[in-house]
Amino acid sequence: MKKYLITFLLAFCLAFIPSAAHQEVDNIVEEIMSRMSLDDKIGQLHQIDGRTDLTKVCDMIRKGQVSSIMNIVDASVIDSLQRIAVEESPSGIPILFARDIVHGFKTILPIPLGQAASFDDALICSAARNTALEATEIGIKWAFAPMMDIARDPRWGRIAEGFGEDPYLASRLAVSVVKGYQGDSLSDELSMAACAKHFVGYGAAEGGRDYNTTYVPVRSLYDTYFPPFKACVEAGVASFMSSFNDNDGVPATGNRWLLTEVLRDEWGFTGMVVSDWGSVGGLIPHGVAKDKKEAAKICLEAGCDMDMMSYSYLNNLKELIAEGDVSMDVVDEAVRRVLRLKVRLGLFEKPYTRKTSESVIYSENVLETACRLAEESSVLLKNDGILPLGEDIKTVLVTGPMADAAYDQMGTWALDGDKAHTLTPVEAIRKNLPSGVKLIYVNSLDYPRDKSPDDFKALKKAARKADVLIAFVGEEQMMSGEAHSLSDLHLQGQQSEMLEALASTGKPLVTVFMAGRPLVIASEMELSDAVLYMWHPGTMGGQAAYNLLWGKANPSGKLPVTFPRNEGQIPIYYNHKHTSHIAKGTEGNLDNVPREMPQSVMGHTSSYLDVAPTPLLPFGFGLSYTTFELSHLRVETPEVRASDSVVVYVDVKNTGDRQGCEVVQAYTGRKSASTTRPMKELKAYERVSLEAGECRTVRLEIPVESLAFCRKDLSWGTEPGNYVLTVGTSSEGGLVSYFKLNH
């Protein structure tokens, strides 16, 4: 009987899957469900970790208690478990194998925060597509990415996993990842389902401490934290993951307003929602459920379809249904969403790992794309004419704990990266250094936190023999990511002392940072003649470093997050709101505070007495080896209506002596509205590549609907009024024009 059922289901799917019409998928799902028992249905709402006793896993599969398994990356094991599910489980429903694939599978890409610095939607999409090719080759069909939590506090370790502080940039890049993972069709063997996470507000953890309380008002959710998720819904993302945090006192995994009223009813999302690891059971420590039975009821009814690893659904739903506390209709709807995804992925038609004659893993094209993305993700923060290194350089000293740290340069969540395939900076320099140029490599610190007593005499002695000094500093991969928050963002260990020792030699010093977050680097920038921020650049980070330092590639990255002067400024971000006492920007000199003067003598502005209110480096900032000039800003239609777009033209000229790429950025702002609004917001950007001396007119389009916000009555829409338009190469300064929105 079971064999007949499996054959019937596969035949049924084969007949309808290619067209991928929603109605046909729904018909398939209903046919499958008509043959499922209650136990089968409950099993389809349960996800487990495969890194456990495989005998136990096999037994659970045979009982129909497993819908999805994560963290198995052996194709033969995946096929073996899948065969048990298809041939021996009661319903014959295939398993969906999943993995946290945040920035590359085997070939590790720059961390997402670094990718965001590229402002290159197309390249990020291509890199994500390569990731899907690698992962699906061994049977992974569901990736827990992209992560799009807006983060404005670099103390939070998971800032590394997202696209920074700006909703517009995060929206565009998250959509690029979704398109890369899912391709043109989920049923394609080369595609895998993306998962928009973490819904929502997780990046607003108080104090930057992971899993901490978040306070995000409804208006801020709509204006700041919702946009990337809504953009992914519109792009067809297959799944969502709820977050660990609460929103206005209700944990996200059990928040019906978020998971049903907003996500499904308001935005029209039809895919499935999975909890984060154990977050269904997490309602107990949150204090809103007395046990897992109550947590299961709350979360399922809220709209969380699949329970990741808390076993709350598996162990309690049958009893809840029997007692009448959970409706069978609610269970059925959750099962439909899970099965719909499996059908769309073609799992019934082709449940096993695809066979390939030639592996794409670590292939030439994949590595080249990863290298290019690492180049474009790197941000040149300072250059006193030392870079790129020229033919006059005959001896190079390379040092620092990140110069040969293959594991650490991959960054957080590089679960399947292999350091044996990772090219470090010193390896790339040694491999590519022109003949006649001598390399001196000094392993001055074993790792970034190394506090070994060292006066660096040997290092300074070696440095005096070199024409240029290159120091690779930063943080280990374990210093960022989940549960890895920091209160002190300065360089750890003896790294700053090492840089001081190098600078004392008087030789030109190039400092290259590899880190998972913005660090506090004001003093290090002063010590250095050039500063390149590479984030954690991934597998090809070493080659990218060589290419950038020697001018084989020209830096074009722009900061996707504001760099603070010190931790006391945090949170600091460019799109802050108007206040009643706006800082002038000249405040912050403690030495100028007079003695025994009236309280009001210093004025009344939103500032500090001991540090300037401005950041060390603004959002959107990044230098190049060439220079650019923007001119002739014009707005095509100075007055627009709600259905229009604001079309902007600006001339961009490469005024330097080499080819380069500039990111032209358009910001809007308004001085009056029904609610307080940000002083400026990024609304468009365009990467433009220009040869030396070349000038080009760049067109930017801002749909008026993108100017919508959460109004005073909490409705979503635009308001008529006058807008300021600023077009520049960062969030500070630029050319200014105006337009008016009429209703």
Briefly describe each language-model feature range.
Residues 739-743:
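Short beta-strand edge segments in extracellular beta-sheet folds
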Residues 1-24:
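Bacterial Sec-dependent N-terminal signal peptides
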